[in-house]
Amino acid sequence: MVNEARGNDSLNPCLEGSASSSSESSKDSSRCSTPGLDPERHERLRDKMRRRMESGDKWFSLEFFPPRTAEGAVNLISRFDRMAAGGPLFIDVTWHPAGDPGSDKETSSMMIASTAVNYCGLETILHMTCCCQRLEEITGHLHKAKQLGLKNIMALRGDPIGDQWEEEEGGFNYAVDLVKHIRSEFGDYFDLCVAGYPKGHPEAGSFEADLKHLKEKVSAGADFIITQLFFEADTFFRFVKACTDMGITCPIVPGIFPIQGYHSLRQLVKQSKLEVPQEIKDVIEPIKDNDAAIRNYGIELAVSLCHELLASGLVPGLHFYTLNREMATTEVLKRLGMWTEDPRRPLPWALSAHPKRREEDVRPIFWASRPKSYIYRTQEWDEFPNGRWGNSSSPAFGELKDYYLFYLKSKSPRELLLKMWGEELTSEESVFEVFVLYLSGEPNRNGHKVTCLPWNDEPLAAETSLLKEELLRVNRQGILTINSQPNINGKPSSDPVVGWGPSGGYVFQKAYLEFFTSRETAEALLQVLKKYELRVNYHLVNVKGENITNAPELQPNAVTWGIFPGREIIQPTVVDPISFMFWKDEAFALWIEQWGKLYEEESPSRTIIQYIHDNYFLVNLVDNDFPLDNCLWQVVEDALELLNRPTQNEREMEAP
């Protein structure tokens, strides 16, 4: 791809097919020594715990289990994203031997934990059991976990298949064997957690014997302990004292189970072989068929237990057994004052917790609303841009062949998407209306609100409210916006709408607008843009690869940056012309993959979406004069006015 000569307002391609998806080499990133904006990104889990304990800052963590279905996997990842907002220190994912836990299936323990780390940015512990497995299998699972970016393992024996425990020849028989093997094979790479049983393991000969086994696990290399659930604070206090007397000094985190239903309580008690206190039974039995009443009681009980634990000074944090539900646990945490939705962001985009991405601090703006897709397409990179985007000539983005990978799939089912986007489209204007309703928040003619688009699976970003009226006006006229940001000139980094990074800094943005529009509008835009050559950078491309840009030598353009005390300037978001050509493949494909395929082939609705896909252009505009008023709206308005201006023949026909 080369620059189109300035002043040429035709849509002849500069170079067709100039960028194609490839993953043959890693991104040539120009690394620098820019200090990390978020210290926790660079810390091991055990170090995060230690720092929190030294400061007295209590934490919470959450346990989940793998779902049984692909749809359940999509829902669980959505739940991860929602519950991440409260600020858990980590989550853990259980190991289900019956569910092929180490496989690449979307319902496997390995894939769910990997997704939490890579695509949800969550510090994650993967449970791993050693019963009924050969040494080679266990070692293979651990190597795979390391490759996927998992750095924390909860080492467990696991439950036997059937009622009787049988030793595995050539395998491990106890959790301590697994701990020793991990330390022997992987050194200090993994942080290791082990289980503690406040009333003793049901298969142990005695409470004292079980404590001895726990001490062996810690001595073998375990970093911290998470306990089985319990119902009374004194049970935990006695356990901690016994551990201390035994010489166990690592953190001991209590496991909390908010009772959420009669049947789930019975099932969990059966599995854990715990006895429910009589006073709890007396309350639950009369209301066992009233789930809401039991849940409310469970919340009250959990809050009371947690208050008692926290007041003791013996508890560094709380670990919640969620049963893959969010309401009860979230409510308990809110009542405890531990659920903290901090609007501050380390960077303007969603982070990944994969160790090799710890230094990453620059991304193209195009994937702002599809961060999981960006992470997927760059997963094979060996290094990630740090300090600046670097050499733009050789980014290698992997192909997005499968739009239905569970962590990239829309959170909304097909039936709901049809209700939002239209069970029947009658014209291009029907599509315009969907974009307008997404921005306005108004229900459509069938009473359904449009809460997502193929390019935006989340509600509108807070900063979009600063542009809402202008966006509504242009979308009504066929400027179908999928990404935008206002110009910002030195707002505090603590600003709740546009702020990011450490406190005490200032953030800046160039105005940015990205949209689909018709060829006719694109041609009018090019004529108008002649007047803005030195101020506005533009790039127009269609699905065939025809493109026109005035980007100087195809260099990346920093559109977001921040200045912070004692640090170099951070520029986390760029408009990169080369990356835009990779993004356009994905952006155009979403018309068909997520919208068009909702309709039958050859149907009028499918034909309309196909026409837009085949004929519209994807455009991005950058206003480089960020201290001045945003000129992009005037550019678009002038283009629309030019487009709607009567031709010479029309004027002659209208003349008297």
UniProtKB/Swiss-Prot annotation:
NAD(+) binds at E63, F64, F65, P66, P67, R68, T94, W95. One of its GO terms (biological process) is tetrahydrofolate interconversion. InterPro entries: FAD-linked_oxidoreductase-like (IPR029041), Fadh2_euk (IPR004621), Mehydrof_redctse-like (IPR003171), MTHFR_C (IPR053806). GO terms for molecular function: FAD binding; methylenetetrahydrofolate reductase (NAD(P)H) activity; methylenetetrahydrofolate reductase (NADPH) activity. The keyword Flavoprotein applies. The keyword NADP applies. Keywords: Allosteric enzyme, FAD, Flavoprotein, NADP, Oxidoreductase, Phosphoprotein. CDD domains: MTHFR. Residues 1-46 are annotated as: Disordered. Phosphorylation of an N-terminal serine-rich phosphorylation region increases sensitivity to S-adenosylmethionine and inhibition. Substrate binds at D159, Q228, Y321, R325. It catalyses: (6S)-5-methyl-5,6,7,8-tetrahydrofolate + NADP(+) = (6R)-5,10-methylene-5,6,7,8-tetrahydrofolate + NADPH + H(+). Pathway: One-carbon metabolism; tetrahydrofolate interconversion. Contains a serine-rich phosphorylation region at the N-terminal and an eukaryote-only S-adenosylmethionine (SAM)-binding domain at the C-terminal. Through asymmetric homodimerization, the two regions are positioned next to each other and N-terminal phosphorylation increases sensitivity to SAM binding and inhibition. Homodimer. PANTHER family: METHYLENETETRAHYDROFOLATE REDUCTASE, METHYLENETETRAHYDROFOLATE REDUCTASE (NADPH). This is Methylenetetrahydrofolate reductase (NADPH). It comes from Macaca fascicularis (Crab-eating macaque). The lineage of its organism: Eukaryota, Metazoa, Chordata, Craniata, Vertebrata. The gene is MTHFR.
